[in-house]
Amino acid sequence: KYQQLREGAYSDIAEFFRLARELGLLAIVRPGPFICAEWEGGGLPAWLKNDFDEELKGLQLRCDNPPFMSRCEKYLTALFSEIRPYFLGNGGNIVMMQVENEYGSYGNDKVYLKKLVDIYRKNGVDAVLFTTDGGGDATVFAGNFPEECLTTLTFGSGVKKGMNRLTQL
């Protein structure tokens, strides 16, 4: 969310990864577009729902919606160009990237997930890609994309139950 508070204005996130690498820290990055429900709008910038912008009318979040996907691609391309030196394959410290967060609780648009993965790969992301979902069958299978991404689960307070479910996948 803080990476792009205003459309086209980006913070200096590369400095964060430079400092982390200098300190010997590895990074798991959640660039989004959606990072978690605990952030207002799931981390999506508020300007995406600007009803006064003609280009954004009809925008639907977290699905294969052309206005949304074009904004995602623009944002991710700008972000990845800044942090590319920190991808593990480039000698950096970014080892994993989350493509979507708990998407199975929201939708099941596999075309959307595939397009996100394609944006990541087109921009040279050289890190393990993953999705995260709750442990129920409906959410796991709706939100994962095992052809391209490692499937991970959130356990909440049910770690034992979650670990048992994970071993069944």
Region spans (language model):
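Residue-level marker for beta-strand->alpha-helix junctions and adjacent short loops that shape enzyme
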Residues: 32-34, 104, 136, 158
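Short, solvent-exposed loop/turn and secondary-structure capping segments
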Residues: 30-32, 38-43, 108-110, 141-143, ...
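Amphipathic, non-transmembrane alpha-helical secondary structure
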Residues: 7-14, 18, 73, 77-81, ...
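Active-site neighborhood of glycoside hydrolase catalytic domains
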Residues: 67-148
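Aromatic- and acidic-residue-enriched carbohydrate-binding clefts of CAZyme catalytic domains
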Residues: 1-9, 13, 37-67
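Glycoside hydrolase catalytic-domain groove-lining segments
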Residues: 138-169
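Hydrophobic faces of well-ordered beta-strands that scaffold small-molecule active sites
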Residues: 27-31, 95-99, 129-131, 151-153, ...
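Aromatic-lined substrate-binding rim segments of carbohydrate-active enzymes
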Residues: 1-40, 117-122, 126
